[in-house]
């Protein structure tokens, strides 16, 4: 039986191949490691799929989705696929500092 991660990090993306690797790397570099990454690729026409497939980490999963780039719909798809106790969002052209999830986990622990 697998234990659910504390966090599901949902990354909706649409034609962000140039930024996506750095976004995913910033999550994989977290000091807090109880997370999964759910990437929702909204019918990208660039190399987004190739960037995602280059990650060989069991915490990274991808969902192919197509609704003409509506980010809210992609987030909802990611939420439904999430296994974590908490869902966090990261846009595919952003990054997190290394302690992001550790600090959020600490706040949750102190004030559930």
Language-model-detected regions and their locations in the chain:
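Nucleotide-sugar donor-binding/catalytic module of glycosyltransferases
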Residues: 1-112
């Amino acid at each position: 039986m697998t234990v659910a991660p504390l966090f599901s990090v949902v990354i909706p993306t649409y034609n962000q191949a140039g930024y996506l690797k750095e976004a995913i790397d910033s999550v994989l570099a977290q000091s807090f490691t109880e997370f999964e990454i759910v990437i929702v690729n909204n019918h990208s026409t660039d190399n987004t799929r190739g960037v995602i497939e280059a990650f060989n980490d069991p915490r990274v999963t991808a969902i192919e989705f197509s609704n003409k780039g509506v980010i809210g719909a992609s987030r909802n798809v990611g939420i439904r696929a999430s296994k974590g106790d908490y869902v966090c969002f990261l846009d595919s052209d952003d990054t997190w500092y290394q302690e992001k999830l550790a600090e959020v986990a600490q706040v949750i622990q102190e004030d559930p």
